[in-house]
Amino acid sequence: MSVVYKKKKRNVVVGVVYIHATYNNIIVTVTDQQGHSLICTSAGACGFKGSKKATPYAAQETASHAVKTVVEQNGMKTVSIKVSGPGAGRESAIRAVQACNLNVTSIKDTTKLPHNGCKLPGRRRV
């Protein structure tokens, strides 16, 4: 007999939305203030395949899907947004979170920049 584990639904009013936008995909994670993950989605998980995952529309749909799910399940009202990565869908994902009737307290860019670290890969020759 198999055992089914269900996550307890808990009321989380304040949370953090992490948006990681790369050149190929976008990953949106919604956590509570302690860092416990409530939902994690990507553009590929929302049905986008190939080069369509890197579009601003895919970022908008992924962010709105994640936030709407958390609002329905946990009753979230206030979020702070942390964005990282150089991807194309950064601004559209932020706008999608703001459009979900949430109180956005802060927007922070947490992209890591090297202080002249490793040598970059060479230019592609086709």
UniProtKB/Swiss-Prot annotation:
GO terms for cellular component: ribonucleoprotein complex; ribosome. InterPro entries: Ribosomal_uS11, Ribosomal_uS11_bac-type, Ribosomal_uS11_sf. GO terms for biological process: translation. The keyword Ribosomal protein applies. Coiled coil: none annotated. It comes from the Bacteria. Keywords: Ribonucleoprotein, Ribosomal protein, RNA-binding, rRNA-binding. Pfam families: Ribosomal_S11. Gene3D superfamilies: Ribosomal protein S11. GO terms for molecular function: rRNA binding; structural constituent of ribosome. Part of the 30S ribosomal subunit. Interacts with proteins S7 and S18. Binds to IF-3. Located on the platform of the 30S subunit, it bridges several disparate RNA helices of the 16S rRNA. Forms part of the Shine-Dalgarno cleft in the 70S ribosome. Belongs to the universal ribosomal protein uS11 family. This is Small ribosomal subunit protein uS11. It comes from Ehrlichia chaffeensis (strain ATCC CRL-10679 / Arkansas).
